[in-house]
Amino acid sequence: MPTITAIAAGEARFNVLVSALQYVDTALPGTNLLGALSGASANLTVFAPTDAAFGQLAKDLGDTGSVTNETAVTSFLVGALPVETIRDVILYNASAGAKTLAQISANPTIATLNGQTITADGKTLTDKDPDLINPSLVQTNIAATNGIIHVIDRVLLPVNLPGNTDGTFTDIVAASGAFDTNGADFDLLLKAVQTTGLAGALANPTADLTVFAPNDAAFLKLAAALARSAPDHSP
């Protein structure tokens, strides 16, 4: 069974994460984050953001380039954030002790390696940035010899990072991305908004609105309820 570092280095979806680890270790001698994640006795839980998660963070911070280009995303983040902030973000995405999803659900307040906490609610993780969509767990319980990895679709942030501006309602809902199995995001709501022609009105930055936004799980419950209540026309 491989270590946490070996798993991250061996999967293309974690290229930006590995590059960030290497950058911090080089820029801050003695940090040795890669070494810590390789240690046989590390016993860590890592919430590992995908490349797409880092791309979304770059976009949130004002990157107008290609957020699917891993090299460009890494370069933007390195230029936009102090190395100490990148280090703290990485440490905030890790916790001492290997924790399965069941253990996280039983004890949802999680102490991280940078001294702050995150809170789990189902598969949603609440961080310290009040402006951006909270990360969701998209794959869980990946076992390593020295801990466990849970894959997340956005980067956990220990602070309200400068440069990230509040998006419009449409921006926030569209950030969910393409249709997937994550019931905590807003793929179905976005489709409904687009289908009804409301996307433009809800994208107006001067609109002063409160929106009660049902997530995908809520829409699926509605569909199931409507199916149960529909009349049976079978012969």
Residue ranges and their predicted role:
Residues 1-235:
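Mature, structured domains of secreted/extracytosolic soluble proteins
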